[in-house]
Regions:
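Contiguous beta-strand segments within globular domains
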Residues: 46-54
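Early exported N-terminus immediately downstream of N-terminal targeting peptides
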Residues: 54-88
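Glycine-rich, aromatic-bearing surface loops/beta-hairpins
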Residues: 41-43, 132, 140-171
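Helix-rich interaction surfaces within compact, conserved domain-sized segments
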Residues: 118-140, 146
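Bacterial N-terminal signal peptides that target proteins for export
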Residues: 4-28
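N-terminal Sec signal peptide cleavage junction
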Residues: 36-37
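Tryptophan-paired
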Residues: 84-126
Length: 171
């Protein structure tokens, strides 16, 4: 690369050097734009379970029907709110939460009877990326009755027992 000295003592670079500098600037700008994508709503991942199974034991909820919700959370503020919310408060306030924060969460609901099994297909939870997912079960006994789902792929199995439930994810 040849530098040229101008009459006022300022050095200027050759066309090749200028093109190199411009290419470096464009590459840095592109890197900044791509890094910004995570900041404008591309965080999280898609809920892509191959199957979701809800299984109620014969003595579930003291032999009574039970409401169950799978909740998908799209932002960190809603995640913080739901992470501490017991199921009783979720079921009492879910309509208000959804109407106030329609882009922050979505959910699917079922009411199962003892001994029932529900198999859901892989398209039951399609939609925007999520940062977290929870299962809430509306048992009448005190307690959180909330489980955070750790994986967003494979099979999801929710086992509902007499007064508690568990969530297992398998490949």
């Amino acid at each position: 690369m040849t530098n040229w000295l101008m009459s006022d003592g300022v050095r200027c670079m050759s066309r090749r050097g200028a093109r190199l500098l411009m290419a470096i600037g464009c590459a840095c700008g592109l890197a900044c734009l791509l890094a910004g994508c995570g900041m404008i709503g591309l965080s999280g991942e898609k809920a892509s379970w191959s199957q979701v199974t809800l299984t109620a034991s014969d003595d579930m909820n003291n032999n009574s029907p039970l409401a169950v919700d799978v909740v998908l959370v799209s932002d960190d503020a809603m995640l913080a709110r739901l992470a501490e919310l017991p199921a009783s408060k979720w079921f009492a306030g879910r309509a208000d939460l959804l109407s106030t924060f329609p882009k922050s969460l979505r959910y699917r609901s079922w009411e199962l009877v003892p001994g029932q099994r529900v198999d859901l297909s892989d398209d039951a939870f399609t939609g925007p990326r999520v940062v977290a997912a929870f299962v809430f079960a509306n048992y009448p006994d005190p307690g959180a009755h909330r489980v955070r789902i750790q994986k967003f792929n494979g099979r999801l199995v929710v086992q509902l027992d007499s007064n508690s439930f568990s969530v297992a994810d398998t490949k």
